[in-house]
Amino acid sequence: ASESAAAVPLADPPAPFLKVRIAGRFDHAREGLLGLEVRGPVLGAHLVTPLLRDGAPPVLVNRGWVPLEGNRPVARPDGPVVVEGWVHPGDRPGTFSATDDAAARRFYTFDPPAIGRALGLPQVAPYGLVVLGPSGGLPDPARTLPRPTNNHLGYVITWYGLALALVGVLAAFAFRRGRPR
């Protein structure tokens, strides 16, 4: 239902994963790349651009996927823009997270305060926005709201497989105990 719902104006603080609309101007001079993602044979990353707002801290916007190599043109709108997407509450680096390279503006964990400092914006919003939209150029935005993983079939196969194996072990044990010596 929320997928087809209209985006609402950004409230401060916003609810995580809420579909919102926000206005401002992109600061393309302070872009960075987030993560690594392979699409087909092409390695790419997500383009993160600060959105400057009047009277409010900048918001880091994940505008979508871009290839790391090649010279395909990436859209960089000038002037005022209105962006729709979902609120990304930010992540904290884990024990096995890759180390960010602030000098190269390469980030592997979406931590808005840390990314903001690395991009020269010490006062960014503690959340970000992931742009939603149709494919049709670069950057290639997300098309759906995030969904939790659904591993139910895998769990069913695992647990029924273990139960079947246990029945087999018990049958072998009972057969051996029941044989005369």
Residue ranges of model-derived segments:
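Surface-exposed, charge/polar-rich loops and edge strands
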Residues: 1-181
